[in-house]
A protein has these predicted regions:
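Bacterial N-terminal signal peptides that target proteins for export
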Residues: 1-8
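Extended amphipathic alpha-helical interaction segments
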Residues: 144-222
């Protein structure tokens, strides 16, 4: 019921936006104050919508493949000998020129560090890269976190702090990067990582995608920096599984699209 209710809220919000967008202009003199009031009402409505989406998003757990997130992936000593070659190299921070890009790579590196831990790989370079990116970004919102490594969790606590500091768009950019990175990793060793999922976890991914796309779509209308993110996550719409079997099949079908989305977000 909870999931249906948020979908209903999203649909109602779309209807409201459509009505306000098509509303005839008032032809009376001195209507600037009226328009200003209407604009304030629209902006407040958008804020309420975004806050609602973030609250729901913050309740969702990370995909069950991450070591420090009570992940269910169990690797044998033999499996740990074959180190993953698909993780983002910590040196990628040198290619992060824009502020949005730095947020996205920070989120992805934090995810990859978790996978490196699972494979008993050294994480010194990840720690150094994450620390450097955090310093470059210099976001006071991160003070609410126990450590910057957990920024990818995109919690409600972090959202509130980033909202206060006027950085909501970066919150959703990190959320998009984190989700794409986790999906990408899952596609690189599907048989192993999919074993960590149950039907609830698979359905949770679908719900996460719906919330993320809704938020990004709304933001892209006001922030041109978010538009590329909207394009990057477009392929995720095909992921609507409610069972593990469906999730595995859909991941296999859109493996290349997920890799392409990752490339867009991390370049």
């Amino acid at each position: 019921m909870k999931k249906l209710s948020i979908f209903a809220v999203a649909l109602a919000a779309v209807a409201f936006a459509a009505c306000t967008g098509n509303k005839p202009q008032i032809e009376q003199n001195g209507t600037d104050s009226v328009k200003s009031f209407e604009q304030e009402q629209i902006e407040e409505n958008i804020k309420v919508q975004m806050d609602s989406l973030a609250a729901e998003f913050g309740k969702l757990k990370a995909l069950p493949i991450l070591k420090d997130q009570n992940g269910n992936v169990i690797l044998s000593d033999e499996e740990k000998q074959v180190k993953p070659d698909y993780l983002l190299n910590p040196s990628a921070i040198e290619d992060a020129i824009t502020l949005p890009g730095k947020y996205r790579i920070l989120s992805a590196l934090s995810i990859d560090k978790q996978i490196a831990i699972a494979y008993d790989m050294p994480t010194d370079e990840y720690d150094e890269a994450i620390a450097k990116l955090s310093a470059d970004i210099n976001d006071p919102s991160f003070k609410v976190l126990d450590n910057t490594d957990s920024a990818f969790e995109t919690s409600s606590k972090l959202y509130d702090a980033m909202e206060e500091n006027g950085r909501i768009n970066f919150f959703w950019q990190m959320a998009a990067s984190a989700l794409i990175e986790q999906l990408y990793i899952t596609t690189q060793n599907t048989d192993k990582f999919i074993a960590a999922f149950d039907d609830n976890a698979a359905e949770s991914v679908t719900y996460r995608i719906v919330l993320l796309q809704d938020a990004i779509e709304r933001l892209s209308a006001y922030d041109p920096e978010v538009k590329p993110i909207s394009d990057a996550i477009e392929p995720l719409k095909v992921l609507n599984a409610i069972t593990v079997d469906q999730f595995k099949s859909q991941l296999e079908e859109c493996k290349e699209q997920i890799a392409a989305s990752r490339k867009i977000l991390l370049n």
